Structures are given as structure tokens and as C-alpha cells.
A protein has these predicted regions:
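Inter-domain linker/hinge segments that demarcate the starts of reverse transcriptase
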Residues: 6-14, 18, 120-136, 183-192, ...
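Conserved polymerase palm-domain catalytic core
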Residues: 11-124, 147-148
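Short, conserved micro-motifs composed of acidic
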Residues: 118-125, 129, 137-162
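Basic, alpha-helical interaction scaffolds
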Residues: 157-225, 286-293
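Extended C-terminal regions of large enzymes
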Residues: 233-234, 245, 249-351
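Short Cys/His-based metal-binding microdomains
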Residues: 274-277, 356-389
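Active-site metal-binding core of divalent-cation-utilizing nuclease and nuclease-like domains
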Residues: 338-366, 392-447
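E2/UBC-UEV (E2-variant) core
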Residues: 444-460
Length: 460
């Protein structure tokens, strides 16, 4: 689709062919209803739907009343894109018949023509005329011509040395980096706002909506051109991740940590893909956009993940393999509902189904809670589950450079004497931690809202 068209246009540009990119003004809202009903005549199966949606004028609500719309496709309609493409297809077909040596690249309302300048001087006016027959008007001032100033002058269209077509840069390589920098800047507000969300929401949003923002650009631009972009994009991602996990950015930026973060969830990572790691694979797979290309990317990605695992310390690899009960702790903040106890929560992707060794099926976050109370994982006694949580806290503190003492300690809070499990030795004062295994860790409570779990814990 879009990616293939971009590669074809860039290849034509490199070969010195002239390129004309046409801009259709407000295309979806100007397509004639007559053209839409011709679609119904050509494809009878679509007639009931088109009759239902377009037989009568559409009501457009406005602050001053209702506007009756009698042109264009319905905004947001599931069939609107299909109807638009089928209605505009005759214009493209007519142009191709008159100028068979001209290549027409059309994705929705984004239409580009490539070929010999002389033939384009004939084909472009034909295309403009044919599109006008279905209600589409071409704005010559916003259209562009690449590789041929003479053709641009003849058509009355601006000549440029590069342009954004289908969301990618086509033209002078020297300006590609500038284009990618602009795309990077557009992502900054998203990452900044994502970091302010609640952590259990922020991490899935970051991995599913933030990280993929680089995919299209990586797949449609040469790795040499995206190298700087990928590095800066990864740094932006890591900055947001550090804010979400509430850890110093310097710790997140360590190469060892970046590799762990990059690994997929199934391998114990966070699934926060590093753009710099996958850029070459992504571009090659896009250029070879077929089954073979997809398999190649899958194979190379698998090989990369194995290489990353092989480069990590054995202790860390062993920890990553604890898929049943390992979770990434994002905070260790006192919770007033727990009598100022530390509330541990784990990040999770709610639709990722995991299976415990006891056979319990659950989502990742709930499984982490279930595993703490699962006798199959930790044994029948409470002490082994207690040890698992205690060990997690100790490892978390050690990784963050906090001095600890895991010898049983006695703490007096001014009211009573308490026996605690861990003492955190901080510059200002010591912090005492006591680990309690409660029903909140059991699978029967794992799916309940946090407020319910807090209420049950407080009562206990």
C-alpha cells in the first residue's frame, strides 16, 4: 500500500523521472453524489448501503442550525473510503489509457504521476479534467513537481527539490534529516503527557501508542537517514519510561537496561522496542513487502533477541526467565489505605493471556498477583510466598543503590514495638519494611478493583 508507493516514488526520483504530486482540495467533502451512485450501478451489492446513506441530504449540525449536505462522503462512515476510491477510479483509468507510459500512484486522495516530462504534460491535465467530473478539484498551488522545473512551469505547478508524500520524504537526501526532525518534534507532546498518566495506564500507552510512532518512518526511509532520528526517538521513549517507573534516567540509559527493556514480554522484557535496533530490519522488510520479507524480518528480529540474551549477565538472564511471577515494579510509595504500608503494583498488558504452572489462566498483571499466592509456584506454606515478595523488594533496592539490612529488626513507632523484615539505610533516616501476604495476592481477588483490595487489606 502506502509503503510500496513510497518506495516506487523514491526509486523514480533517483532514476531522474519527473514526479507530479496533485493536491485535491477537501476531497472527501466534494465528491459528487452522482459519482457515488455510479458506484452502486457498477457494484450492485453496495446499492442498499449507498441508498441508505446517500439517497437523501445529510444533516450537518451547526451552532446556527442544520446544514443540508448534498455532496461528499459521510465523515467517519466505514464505507466512505471504499466509496471514494471506487468513485475516483474511472478518472485514474482514463488517464492511464490516454498516457499508458505514465505511472499513476494513487492512495485515496493522494495522487502522484511519474514518467517522461513530455508525456506528463499531457497526462496531468487529463487527470485534472477527469477528477473534476466526479467533483474533485486540484489545487495547483499546493501541488508540486519534482525533478523537472520546465514541466512545472508548463503546468503552472510549483517546482520543489523534495516533498512530503504519503507521510514520507521524497526528494533531496540532504533535507531528509530536517524532515525527520520535524516528525520527531511532533511526538514530544505525546511522550510528555504520557509520562504524567497513572503508571499502570502510562506503560501500555507508551508501548502500544508511543513506540509504534517510529515504525512507519523507519520502514519508509533508508537506515542511514533514520539513524539520528532513531537514537533521538529512543531517548525520548526512555525519558518517558524513566518518569513512569520513577527511576533516574541515567539508570534507564544503561546499555544493559535498554536491551532488557527492548526484549518482548514473552522473554521477560518490557516490549519497549528500540528504534535503533530494528531500523535496518524494518526498512528491508518494507522494501521486500511480501511473505518472504515478513519472514525475513521475523527471523532477524528473533536472532537479534537471542543475541541480546547472549550479551546479558547470567544472573540477569535467569531473572528474565522467571516469567511466572516476575513483574516490573514501577513504584514503592507509601499508601495511606494500608496504614502507610508500601503498596507494590506491577505493570501489565491486560489482554496478554498467561498460564501459571498450576493451570490458572489470567492476564499478566493479575497473574503476578496470583503467583504470589499460588502453592504450585512457591510451595504450600505462606513463608515461601513471603520470601518471594521480600526478595523482590531487596533486589529492587539494591538495583537502585539503597543500602539494606535483611536481618529481622525491631522497630518502635512510638506506640508499639513491631518486628520488621527489612531496614533501608537512608542518609536522613532508616525506613522499616514489613512484608505481609494477604488475600489481595490470591487469584480470587486478582481481578478486583484496587479500591476493593485496599478495603479488604485494611480490614484484615
Amino acid at each position: 500500500g502506502c509503503e510500496k508507493t513510497i518506495h516506487e516514488l523514491r526509486s523514480a526520483y533517483k532514476d531522474g523521472k519527473a514526479i507530479v504530486s496533485l493536491d485535491a482540495t477537501n476531497a472527501y467533502n466534494t465528491l459528487s453524489r452522482e459519482a457515488i451512485f455510479k458506484v452502486a450501478d457498477r457494484f450492485p451489492i453496495m446499492k442498499p448501503l449507498i441508498t441508505l446513506m446517500y439517497a437523501n441530504p445529510s444533516h450537518l449540525l451547526h451552532k446556527d442550525g442544520v446544514i443540508m449536505s448534498e455532496v461528499g462522503t459521510r465523515q467517519g462512515g466505514n464505507s466512505s473510503s471504499t466509496i471514494f476510491c471506487v468513485a475516483a477510479a474511472p478518472a485514474i483509468k482514463s488517464t492511464s489509457q490516454i498516457s499508458p507510459n505514465v505511472d499513476v500512484h494513487a492512495i485515496m486522495d493522494d495522487i502522484s504521476l511519474t514518467g517522461d516530462a513530455q508525456e506528463l504534460s499531457v497526462a496531468v491535465p487529463v487527470m485534472i479534467t477527469e477528477l473534476a467530473k466526479v467533483g474533485l478539484r486540484i489545487n495547483l498551488k499546493k501541488s508540486v513537481v519534482l525533478n523537472c522545473p520546465e514541466l512545472a512551469a508548463r503546468l503552472g505547478i510549483p517546482a520543489v527539490d523534495g516533498a512530503k508524500i504519503l507521510g514520507a520524504w521524497i526528494g533531496d537526501d540532504g533535507k531528509c534529516e530536517e524532515f525527520l526532525d520535524k516528525q520527531l518534534n511532533k511526538c514530544k507532546p505525546f511522550f510528555a503527557l504520557t509520562a504524567k498518566l497513572a503508571p499502570e495506564i502510562a506503560l501500555p500507552v507508551l508501548s502500544r501508542c508511543g513506540v509504534p510512532r517510529s515504525n512507519y518512518l523507519l520502514r519508509t526511509h533508508l537506515p542511514d537517514h533514520t539513524k539520528k532520528f532513531a537514537i533521538n526517538f529512543d531517548d525520548m521513549t526512555l525519558t518517558a519510561l524513566a518518569a513512569i517507573l520513577r527511576v533516574p534516567l541515567e539508570q534507564i540509559r544503561r546499555e544493559e537496561v535498554i536491551r532488557c527493556i527492548h526484549l518482548p514480554l514473552a522473554m521477560g522484557g518490557l516490549g519497549i522496542t528500540a528504534a535503533a535496533f530494528i531500523a535496518p530490519f524494518a526498512y528491508d522488510a518494507s522494501v521486500n513487502a511480501d511473505v518472504e520479507g515478513a519472514e525475513t524480518q521475523k527471523s532477524l528480529t528473533s536472532q537479534l533477541n537471542k543475541t541480546i540474551i547472549g550479551s546479558l549477565p547470567e544472573e540477569l538472564v535467569a531473572h528474565l526467565k522467571l516469567g511466572e511471577n516476575a513483574g516490573w515494579i514501577y513504584s514503592m510509595q507509601p499508601n495511606p489505605h494500608y496504614g502507610q504500608g508500601i503498596l507494590l503494583q506491577v505493570t501489565g498488558h491486560s489482554d496478554v493471556v498467561c498460564i501459571c504452572s498450576c493451570g490458572h489462566r489470567s492476564t499478566q498483571r493479575e497473574l503476578a498477583l496470583h503467583a504470589l499466592g499460588c502453592t504450585k509456584v512457591h510451595g504450600p506454606n505462606v513463608s515461601s510466598r513471603h520470601a518471594a515478595v521480600k526478595s523482590t523488594i531487596i533486589n529492587f533496592c539494591k538495583r537502585n543503590g539503597i543500602a539494606i539490612s535483611d536481618e529481622p529488626v525491631v522497630y518502635h513507632d512510638g506506640i508499639s514495638t513491631k518486628r520488621c523484615d527489612i531496614r533501608l539505610v537512608l542518609p536522613t533516616e532508616d525506613v522499616y519494611v514489613d512484608v505481609t501476604i494477604a488475600n489481595a495476592a490470591c487469584k480470587t481477588h486478582a481481578g478486583k478493583p484496587l479500591s476493593t483490595i485496599e478495603r479488604n487489606k485494611t480490614r484484615e
